[in-house]
Amino acid sequence: MSEINQNVKDSRQQYYQHISGQNLTPLWESLHHLVPQTPNANCAPAYWNYQEIRPLLMESGNVIGAKEAIRRVLVLENPALRGQSSITATLYAGLQLILPGEVAPSHRHNQSALRFIVEGKGAFTAVDGERTPMHTGDFILTPQWRWHDHGNPGSEPVVWLDGLDLPLVNLLGCGFAEDCPEDQQPVTRKEGDYLPRYAANMLPLRHQRGNSSPIFNYRYDRSREALHDLTRMGDPDEWEGYKLRYVNPVTGGYPMPSMGAFLQLLPKGFASRVARSTDSTIYHVVEGAGQVTIGNETFHFSAKDIFVAPTWHEVSFRSSEDTVLFSFSDKPVQEALGLFREARY
């Protein structure tokens, strides 16, 4: 029987080599992988201790200037995706440093980008002719094809977490970019111009709707206050604690079409139940400390640390003190395609 099986195997292998010359391959050899019963893990659970990598990030300031680098970033590469500049199969993340007196030159691209400020003060981001100051915990958007630059006229280094849909856009083969003739784009609107127009539950009469939120700085003091107020309204969700999502005030949807962003508070002593979802999610610890179990791995985290939970991995949290987590994922894309799924246990 084994001899017959080996003969069949050899015959098939000869056939596969024969059809390969015509750029053909047999589906039956890969069908179970292509159409799995449950999602294939396309990245691995991973964790970055900020206090360990911070000296390396600061050292990059001596290696290259912000203008030469264009964006001086240490990419957070998933250990299962080394060499691909990806933290998940669809998303990119990195830590960007801008030193006092530096400017990160203006450019634009059709990849959507988000910034979450990790530390420092005195820097700004300019988007589409308007500047906004960057404070720790602020969530800042640079939407598709909008001119944006960063500057630091302050006296201390400023670091933020970058999140982009680079792998997704590159997979689709539709990436475009353009450099601005000047390092800094002209400022055409007053600082805070977006606030009375879009951040007070009202809209200008003749607002022209785009595909991203017109609010490009979701200030942490306001978001944190919302979480605090929510804790007074009832008990936390058993899986997520107190969790809110950032929204586009025009549509009620996500701030950007390809990435959803969230902020959640885990009260001191909170132990969540287990959940999993199809959107691989990147987490940044804004405040607090605790531990997270992702699949079979447990990571102990503290403020400013970063970790990633891959698709369809069971996730649970324990907080040793009041903890605030910022997170982002490709959930909007999955929902738009009717693919998103979650389970709670």
Task: For each feature predicted by the language model, list its residue ranges.
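A short, N-terminal "cap"/entry segment at the start of jelly-roll beta-barrel domains
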Residues: 1-88, 185-258, 262
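Double-stranded beta-helix
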Residues: 2-15, 153-216, 319-345
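Activation on folded, globular domain regions of eukaryotic proteins
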Residues: 47-50, 94, 161
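A short beta-loop-beta micro-motif enriched in histidine and acidic residues
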Residues: 81-92, 99-113, 129, 251-260, ...
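A short beta-strand-loop-beta hairpin characteristic of the jelly-roll/cupin
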Residues: 99-136, 142-146, 275-303
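Conserved metal-binding segment of the jelly-roll/cupin
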Residues: 127, 133-154, 160-165, 294, ...
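Active-site lining segments that contact anionic ligands and/or coordinate catalytic metals
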Residues: 241, 258-261, 279-280, 287-289, ...
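C-terminal structured domain segments across diverse proteins
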Residues: 250-252, 259-265, 275-278, 288, ...
